[in-house]
């Protein structure tokens, strides 16, 4: 039996993620009390053999004590031979406020208290910390559309099996903050910046003009090589620890030139050596899977 547990901040897309899994054949249960997880597994194990892929969502409406005990519960479930993934969805608090304002829905924690919406959003994050801290996959939906979130769930959750590592390289601009789902971050702001050349400003790091500019500087190649060597040294250790996902983020000031160039270079290099490589340019709104020949497939 494979169990996917969806949790995260209200308004971050848990219902969309659960629906995406249901559409892909998972037996889906929304807002399951954590205390009923073990009895549910026992019942489903005795049920139809077709129910081998289960998806449940857990949110902050659980009692705080139940949420604090979640890590222990998860260990008990895995100890019974259940293959279990915890997917945690989050988003910037400002984005969540905007989403609630747009839909005019009430936050779950404001229904039985006098908390403001902003207070409820922050309190919920505290309640869910035990789940967030042990999440196998953390997805920041701040800049994702519904379609993009469904695609991410299909790519990174439903298609996952066995000891396969999905390696994502993501470019970003520090102006908009570090991606919340990044496992490691490299800062490229020390490299020469094409932005200050008016003739290059309108291009991005995928364009030949920017590639030529950056590759004229030895430090650019040196940084790319250093990141590559570090990953080649430590990727086997991540695989050995049963890690399923690894997101390597590279940032520059605006996320248009230097970080994009480095992510393209790194992603195509590793796609020649392994499957499961993806690239994402946050500020350009681009994401793609790379087959082992290194050619992107959006």
From Swiss-Prot:
Residues bound to ATP: 8-15
Which molecular-function annotations from GO does this UniProt entry contain?
A: ATP binding; GTP binding
Keyword annotations for this protein, in alphabetical order, are: ATP-binding, GTP-binding, Nucleotide-binding
Report the InterPro entries cross-referenced here. P-loop_NTPase, RapZ-like, RapZ-like_N, RapZ_C
| Any Pfam family matching the protein | PapZ_C
Q: Which residues bind GTP?
A: 59-62
The entry sums up its family as follows:
Belongs to the RapZ-like family.
Record HAMAP family: RapZ_like
Instruction: Tell me, in a sentence or two, what this protein's role is.
Output: Displays ATPase and GTPase activities.
Name of this protein:
Nucleotide-binding protein Csal_2229
Q: Which organism is it from?
A: Chromohalobacter salexigens (strain ATCC BAA-138 / DSM 3043 / CIP 106854 / NCIMB 13768 / 1H11)
Question: What is the organism lineage in this UniProt record?
Answer: Bacteria, Pseudomonadati, Pseudomonadota, Gammaproteobacteria, Oceanospirillales
